[in-house]
Amino acid sequence: MPTQFKIAIDGPAASGKSSAASCLAQKLNFQRLDCGSIYRAITFIVLSEFTTLPSLDSSNVKGFIENIKICVKNQRIYFNNRDITDELRGEMIDRTVGKIAKVKYIRQKVHKIERDIIDNCKGGIVVDGRDIGTVVMPDADLKFFITASAETRAKRRCLQNESHNYDEILNEINKRDYDDIHREIDPLRQAEDAIIIKNDDITFDETIDLLIKKYNEKIHQLNK
């Protein structure tokens, strides 16, 4: 087995990739990097500074964003020595993060943060996002693309929060899928060598079992 083993997990919104990545990393005793949380952190910081989303092309906003210093430690995100991890989930951030994530200079900044973390990782790491196997970590030892139909993903979101309206959530997911797939820079797509996991008809535990099975097969192959 190589001294550093890298696993990339990509997939659309609400596919369960983040939960799967977290569980897989825990079971393998690997480090885990949630790339979506970095975009959320930048979104949170920008909204905290400007209240509403400003023009991302203006020089003062660009300068502010480029000077943001984020630290990721033990799956927690710190800004100005403050843990902001638990503040990154909310409707405003949900509605805004897609606009932040499609801006070229922001993506370049996030990619640098991600690659620095990956390069400094000792041992194994599980990295999840939307462009991991294609852009951030194309040299990953193992790549997964976790997906499900938009309808399945909307139903799961509603089960997690009964106050959600199914039709509204479905529309949001379809819009996010369209935006991710048609994004000019680093669109969502599966890597050619990724293992596709469609989890419409399997449980979360079965998904994890399948990921571990594929990992063990890869380790066996490397040890031959």
Swiss-Prot record:
Catalytically driven reaction(s): CMP + ATP = CDP + ADP; dCMP + ATP = dCDP + ADP
Binding site for ATP: G11, P12, A13, A14, S15, G16, K17, S18, S19
GO terms of biological process kind: nucleobase-containing small molecule interconversion
UniProt KW keywords: ATP-binding, Kinase, Nucleotide-binding, Transferase
GO cellular component labels: cytosol
EC annotation from Swiss-Prot or TrEMBL: 2.7.4.25
GO molecular function terms noted in the UniProt entry: ATP binding; CMP kinase activity; dCMP kinase activity
Keyword ATP-binding appears in the UniProt entry: yes
Family stated for the protein in its record: Belongs to the cytidylate kinase family. Type 1 subfamily.
PANTHER family, sorted: CYTIDYLATE KINASE, CYTIDYLATE KINASE/PANTOATE-BETA-ALANINE LIGASE
Name this protein carries in UniProt: Probable cytidylate kinase
The organism's taxonomic lineage, starting at the top: Eukaryota, Fungi, Fungi incertae sedis, Microsporidia, Enterocytozoonidae
